[in-house]
Amino acid sequence: MLEFAVSAPFDPAFDISSSIVPATFPWLSLSILFPIVGAFIVPFVPDDGDGKQVRWFALGIALTTFLITAAAYLTGYDPSYSGLQLSERVSWLPNLGLTWAVGADGLSMPLILLTSFITALAVLAAWPVTFKPKLFFFLILAMDGGQIAVFAVQDMLLFFLAWELELLPVYLLLAIWGGKKRQYAATKFILYTAGSSLFILLAALAMGFFGGGVPNFEYSVLAQKGFSTGFELLCYAGLLIAFGVKLPIVPLHTWLPDAHGEATAPVHMLLAGILLKMGGYALMRFNAEILPVAHAQFAPLLVVLGVVNIIYAALTSFAQRNLKRKIAYSSISHMGFVLIGIGSFSELGTSGAMLQMISHGLIGASLFFLVGATYDRTHTLQLDEMGGIGQKMRIMFALWTVCCLASLALPGMSGFVSELMVFAGFATDEAYTLSFRIVIDGLAAIGVILTPIYLLSMLREIFFGKENSELVSHSNLVDSEPREVYIIGCLLVPIIGIGLYPKLMTDSYSNTISALVRRDVDAMERITRPTAPLIRSTSLVPAVFSAPKLTQASQPVS
């Protein structure tokens, strides 16, 4: 029997909303199933061999999916409410605790919109694909439904299934349409991600069966089970590994440069724009929200790992002469700010982490699309073989410049706001000592300084370096076409809009973030040592890690 509601509400004692808003129309189920059903129709679309009809059909499905998610946001989602909305629940196998439960709150709704938006643009970016177009667009649409499901489902076993569903399309998109080392990159991707997913399954089963009785895997139930501290720490560690691979966290990152190095432009957009955000979202949803006591223990480790991401990846990006790998390491560096924000106990810092995921999704997709467009013309990714093409590709240079400025966090762009929020949120987070905050913000600032250096030097080498006469004289070296300008324009509109008026995005999730931070702060205050005895009790760790009792729970979101 279908009923638009979920099981027991969150316990108010944990500062989780005590009521859930049921859906009046199954928007989220439709947004998940529509692209998947569309994918299975793709093989039956009449085609003359060039893939034209298939491309238009796939674009129609992707755009309709985006309109469905937009309608869900506009008609059924209230940004001022912190709890679960658009909730649907279908009893599936009750004896096994399996339920089709979907819903959206401030953590998931912005990322659902981001997923459908970038997928629609990725389909448009895939217009030149003529090799096995039916299979290509089948995989893109199936991946769209799977990624939306990751953000929308409210059952941990369903989450695991959705997490696995998007792995196979990515593997095939890399293995069939990738570069010369595509088999290696695809195999490495599947080994890393599928192997780490085992930790999600084990944690889900352990948490669902905890306490005996009929198992239940719904997030609302798991959040109220009252796990023991040791159990939480064990589950948290396993989930951190699984989600750390996807984010990625150094040293679990090595699959990403290889995958980006061999992927095509539309696959780049999906990897950078959506796939990495799944890791950040899952850390917030499970590690921070459902396992708050363990999160209070692990939070300083997340902060340190975030700084390592920022500095290590930025320095590594300097050494890269391959354009795709350079941007890939830049992505890893920027995701370090997400870790710092999640590890903070302030609303401002955590809100900054959320905004950084959205911002990087847009900026990363734009940069990797431009990498693909440039490669289509130059047929090389080596910076040493480029140079002097700015005179023949002036519009392309302008697009590259604006997107690089967005990536280096130029004021007026979304990246500036998100990184500033993380910096300010952590600097005012009284859960940590002043000296620790100064050290972390100071080290993270190094990454902010390094980013414009390697990005602007990259621009110079591509467009104004030593001229490659053979490359410059090549007939393929033409300027950007209207389709490419349109795609970048669509990405720049929200990048600049959020940069000029952040409330366009922050208002959609600020109340959910407030509830999440209050829950984590409450957990911190209830354990013996306010923060992270797992890390801070050892004498081998400097006193900079010790923390006083929290006196101020949160900071306002700007």
Curated annotation (Swiss-Prot):
The keyword Membrane applies. It is a multi-pass membrane protein. Its main location: membrane. It comes from the Bacteria. InterPro entries: NADH_Q_OxRdtase_chain4 (IPR022997), NADH_Q_OxRdtase_chainM/4 (IPR010227), NADH_UbQ_OxRdtase (IPR003918), ND/Mrp_TM (IPR001750). One of its GO terms (cellular component) is plasma membrane-derived thylakoid membrane. Keywords: Membrane, NAD, NADP, Plastoquinone, Quinone, Thylakoid, Translocase, Transmembrane, Transmembrane helix. It catalyses: a plastoquinone + NADH + (n+1) H(+)(in) = a plastoquinol + NAD(+) + n H(+)(out); a plastoquinone + NADPH + (n+1) H(+)(in) = a plastoquinol + NADP(+) + n H(+)(out). One of its GO terms (biological process) is ATP synthesis coupled electron transport. It is an enzyme of class 7 (translocase). It is found in: Cellular thylakoid membrane. Its EC number is 7.1.1.-. The chain crosses the membrane at residues 25-45, 56-76, 90-110, 111-131, 133-153, 157-177, 189-209, 230-250, 264-284, 298-318, 327-347, 353-373, 397-417, 438-458, 485-505. GO terms for molecular function: NADH dehydrogenase (ubiquinone) activity; ubiquinone binding. It holds the Pfam family Proton_antipo_M. Belongs to the complex I subunit 4 family. HAMAP family: NDH1_NuoM. NDH-1 shuttles electrons from NAD(P)H, via FMN and iron-sulfur (Fe-S) centers, to quinones in the respiratory chain. The immediate electron acceptor for the enzyme in this species is believed to be plastoquinone. Couples the redox reaction to proton translocation (for every two electrons transferred, four hydrogen ions are translocated across the cytoplasmic membrane), and thus conserves the redox energy in a proton gradient. This is NAD(P)H-quinone oxidoreductase chain 4. The lineage of its organism: Bacteria, Bacillati, Cyanobacteriota, Cyanophyceae, Synechococcales. The gene is ndhD.
